[in-house]
């Protein structure tokens, strides 16, 4: 253990698309943080920044189901920003994302992931049809949240 510690790899030189699918979890976290900043600076819910993600639910599902716990939490945070700022445009991703979110995040050992997962579910309800949307067909919202809070 002689010499200085190895330098952290700089992932900012890679494109966001490359970082989102990178094998290193730190690269994926970097992409998620970049996307949160991008989504926060959009001027409308029809901004072109959302287009690559609206029609790519497979990528969004991979973000929610990230194998690294830290990256998963940042990924769910990224999707909260995505749904919040893309608005009703993002509502069409709900049907693909929520089952994975419930399976992978609601029971997470990380409190931050659980909190963000609930926030994401609530964001979907808020943006879809003015809050009158169905979260999971056939299941009442109180039934979904009972195991988490009670």
Predicted regions and their residues:
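N-terminal helical submodule of small eukaryotic multi-pass membrane proteins
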Residues: 49-64, 68-81
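N-terminal "cap/leader" segments of large eukaryotic alpha-helical scaffolds
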Residues: 1-43
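Generic alpha-helical secondary structure signal
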Residues: 11, 30-33, 74, 96, ...
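Short, flexible active-site-proximal loops enriched in glycine and acidic residues
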Residues: 68-72, 88-94
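Hydrophobic residues within the alpha-helices of tandem HEAT/HEAT-like
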Residues: 20, 34-40, 64, 75-86, ...
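Core helices of alpha-solenoid repeat scaffolds
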Residues: 7-16, 46-61, 90-102, 129-140
